[in-house]
Amino acid sequence: MNFLDESFLLAVSFVIFIYLIYRPAKKAILNSLDTKIIEIQEKVLKAKKLKEDAALLFEQTKVQIQKLEALRSQMIEESDKATQKIIQDKTKAMEEFLEQKKADAIQLIQNQKLIASKDLQDEFCDEVITLVSKYFRSVQLSERSIAKNLMDKSDFAHNASHATHLH
């Protein structure tokens, strides 16, 4: 093998050519790879940041949901209390109304009872007067003798009660 052989020189020249081309290309490839690595690292950092932000947002949302649940429970409890109070107030008002109506009805019944009793007394008195008048007319007494009889009986009753007071 001859070192000056053309195929050997061609091979050495090709290796040198590749080396000379590879050297600047190596820098460009390494720079390109470094740039890609930096871009990927930035994307990974952004993804981590997004993940952390999402986790933080999730926790904040979870806290807000818990607060809303507590607020909802409180509102339900307050509305239940308000409803119970309204029911109690309306029940009390209804009971008072019914008691008032009951008292009014009792008063009305008593008034009607008094009116009916007075009407019966008036009818009874009218009937007694009519019967007494008919009796006195039937026995053919004059009005004067009727009045005298009534006066005598009235004086007798008055004297009798006066006499009992003296004893």
From Swiss-Prot:
Membrane topology type: Single-pass membrane protein
Keyword annotations: ATP synthesis, Cell inner membrane, Cell membrane, CF(0), Hydrogen ion transport, Ion transport, Membrane, Transmembrane, Transmembrane helix, Transport
Signal peptide (from-to): none
Main location: membrane
Gene Ontology terms: cellular component: plasma membrane; proton-transporting ATP synthase complex
GO molecular function list: proton-transporting ATP synthase activity, rotational mechanism
A Pfam family of this chain: ATP-synt_B
Keyword Ribosomal protein: no
Functional note: F(1)F(0) ATP synthase produces ATP from ADP in the presence of a proton or sodium gradient. F-type ATPases consist of two structural domains, F(1) containing the extramembraneous catalytic core and F(0) containing the membrane proton channel, linked together by a central stalk and a peripheral stalk. During catalysis, ATP synthesis in the catalytic domain of F(1) is coupled via a rotary mechanism of the central stalk subunits to proton translocation.
Family: Belongs to the ATPase B chain family.
Protein name per UniProt: ATP synthase subunit b
Organism listed in the record: Rickettsia typhi (strain ATCC VR-144 / Wilmington)
Phylogenetic lineage: Bacteria, Pseudomonadati, Pseudomonadota, Alphaproteobacteria, Rickettsiales
Underlying gene: atpF
